[in-house]
Amino acid sequence: MNSGIDLQGTFIKSLIDLGIPPGTAKAIWMPLPMILMLIGATVGVLVCVWLERKISAAAQQRIGPEYIGPLGLLAPVADGLKLVFKEDIVPAQADPWLFTLGPILVVLPVFLSYLIVPFGQNIVITNVGTGIFLWIALSSIQPIGLLMAGYSSNNKYSLLGGLRAAAQSISYEIPLALSVLAIVMMSNSLSTVDIVNQQSDYGILGWNIWRQPLGFMIFWIAALAECERLPFDLPEAEEELVAGYQTEYSGMKFALFYLSSYVNLILSALLVAVLYLGGWDFPIPINVLANLVGVSEANPVLQVVSAALGITMTLVKAYFLVFIAILLRWTVPRVRIDQLLDLGWKFLLPVGLVNLLLTAALKLAFPVAFGG
């Protein structure tokens, strides 16, 4: 198996070669992954917002952003700057502490979840053995922030939106976790890196989507509900609740909700790519490519090309799923709250349990194909 390029080791070694003490070199490296994560997630959101506006315009036979930068690429930046410089208003009867804490509790867990997303063999901020468990734990914090935002606003629409958001998030977390448990069972690991490695032996034929089509559908539907994307955007349904739990928010606090929504969408797409679509894995195994060009897998140039290909493949897979999510916004009608809860509790939950039991049975019956 290709061990990948060791970015941390290479960076620290380069600094040591320049005469910097090893301790100082390690200290310089420590904040870099977090800074890169924040920059990468923010740029990803800007790209996602631009795509949403252009795809939405195309779906409605419009042009969309056109004049703010080439092809309107700077329109999301203009939107962000506008929100940053807007006045931050706190309603007179609101609870100021909870009102401020709500958006922070919503956006922080989403950013922290990026810690376990691998873009390559060694291109991951923290490869912890319980990465999937960490992500599930972090995602369960978000409903608390949504409830805080809805309750503290002292507004009936905000409260209803917060209650809807919490109910929706809790309802779909369980099917989401069940679909992931089936993947964990096949991979014998909670590490996202191990899960991708388990899919890398046979190229595109080794991807988990072929062995877990049911789990893939459950995960994708539940992820859309967690991100509050149409047809599951009931917490902020404009026709019913003005803007839901965001009704009383303005300025930077509103921007945090806006940011959280898109960061969560990209995170969900990345996790689908990692868990079901082989992550950074190229459809043709790297050892086959190495044999075709007649070089060793340990060749430094091949390692760099492999790392670049890995990042590209992960992002291509993720943004294809983002494209599907945006397209769904204009093709599927919004469901009612009772339909949404029925889908989560009466359909996805039982199907998720059956899928988990079926995976366990297939693992015992066909250990080679299902990771026995």
From Swiss-Prot:
The EC class name is translocase
User: Disulfide pairs?
Assistant: none
Write down the InterPro entries for this protein, in alphabetical order.
NADH_UbQ_OxRdtase_su1/FPO, NADH_UbQ_OxRdtase_su1_CS
The protein's location, in the record's own words, is: Cellular thylakoid membrane
Q: What membrane topology is annotated for this entry? A: Multi-pass membrane protein
Coarsely, its chief localization is: membrane
- Please list the reactions this protein catalyses: a plastoquinone + NADH + (n+1) H(+)(in) = a plastoquinol + NAD(+) + n H(+)(out); a plastoquinone + NADPH + (n+1) H(+)(in) = a plastoquinol + NADP(+) + n H(+)(out)
PROSITE patterns tied to this protein: COMPLEX1_ND1_1, COMPLEX1_ND1_2
- What role does it play? NDH-1 shuttles electrons from an unknown electron donor, via FMN and iron-sulfur (Fe-S) centers, to quinones in the respiratory and/or the photosynthetic chain. The immediate electron acceptor for the enzyme in this species is believed to be plastoquinone. Couples the redox reaction to proton translocation, and thus conserves the redox energy in a proton gradient.
The family note in this entry says: Belongs to the complex I subunit 1 family.
The identity of this protein, by name, is NAD(P)H-quinone oxidoreductase subunit 1
Write down the species. Answer: Nostoc sp. (strain PCC 7120 / SAG 25.82 / UTEX 2576)
